[in-house]
Amino acid sequence: MATFTDAEIDELFETSGTVIDNIITAQGKPAETVGRSAIPQGKTKVLSAAWEKHGSIQPPASQDNPDRQDRSDKQPSTPEQTTPHDSPPATSADQPPTQATDEAVDTQLRTGASNSLLLMLDKLSNKSSNAKKGPMVEPPRGESPTSDSTAGESTQSRKQSGKTAEPSQGRPWKPGHRREHSISWTMGGVTTISWCNPSWSPIKAEPKQYPCFCGSFPPTCRLCASDDVYYGGDFPKSK
C-alpha cells in the first residue's frame, strides 16, 4: 500500500482543487460584444435560422394595402420593392463571424482546460508511483546494512565482556555472608532479630538460617562473629 507524507497529502489536495476549478471553468465566459447585447453561447445557429425563416415568409402584397396593389398595376415594379423580401435583415449577415468567433473561443478554452487536466493527472500519477517505490527500496542480496553489522558486533562484544565481568564491574566477586533482620511486634514490645546467611541463599519472608553445602562460604564473618549459634543450629536469640 502506498504511503504519503503530510507534505505530499497537502500537495495532492491542492492539485485536486486546481483540477476541480479547471473543470468548473472549462466553458469560460461568452465573447463580449460592443454596441449590442451579448448572444448566449450555443444560440447563434438557432437565431440565424429564425431570421432566415422570418425573412422567407412574407404576407402577400394584396393583403397589405389595396391601393398599393392598384398602383402597382399601373407602375412597373422596381428592384427596391423586391429585394427586402428576398434577403434577411442586415444583422443576420453579421452572425456567421460572431458564430465563428464564439466557436473558436470555446474550442480554445476547452483545449486549454484539457491540457491542464492532463498535466494534473500526470503529476498525480507520478506522485503515486514515487510514493509506492520509496518505502520498498531494499539493499541488494548478499550485502547487509552497515548498521546491522555494527549492531551485531557491539552485541557480541557486550556478551563477551559480560562473561568476564559477570559478578561485579569494579572488583572480583568472593563468597561471603549477607546480614538479614527480622522485626516483630508483640504484647511485650518490639523484637528485633539479626543473623547472617550465605550469599547464595534465597531471601524469604520467614526468618531462616541456611548452612553452607559447598564449603566455599566462611562459617563466620565480622558481622556474625559474636552471634551465639551459626549454621544449622537453633535460631539466633533476640537481643
Swiss-Prot record:
Gene3D superfamilies xref list: 4.10.80.340
Pfam family, one: zf-Paramyx-P
Organism listed in the record: Newcastle disease virus (strain Chicken/United States/B1/48) (NDV)
Gene that produces this protein: V
Domain of life the protein comes from: Viruses
Entry keyword annotation includes ATP-binding: no
Localization terms from the record: Host cytoplasm; Host nucleus
Residues where Zn(2+) 1 binds: H177, C196, C221, C224
Organism ancestry: Viruses, Riboviria, Orthornavirae, Negarnaviricota, Haploviricotina
Compositionally biased tracts (Basic and acidic residues): 65-74
Function, as annotated: Protects the virus against cell antiviral state by blocking host interferon signaling. Mechanistically, targets host phosphorylated STAT1 (phospho-STAT1) for degradation, thereby inhibiting the interferon alpha signaling pathway. Plays a role in the inhibition of host apoptosis. Interacts with and down-regulates the expression of host TXNL1. In turn, inhibits TXNL1-induced apoptosis through the BCL2-BAX-caspase 3 pathway. Inhibits host apoptosis also by negatively regulating host CacyBP/SIP. Promotes viral replication by activating the extracellular signal-regulated kinase (ERK) pathway.
GO cellular component: host cell cytoplasm; host cell nucleus
The protein's assembly and partners: Interacts with host STAT1. Interacts with host TXNL1. Interacts (via C-terminus) with host CacyBP; this interaction inhibits host cell apoptosis.
Protein name (Swiss-Prot/TrEMBL): Protein V
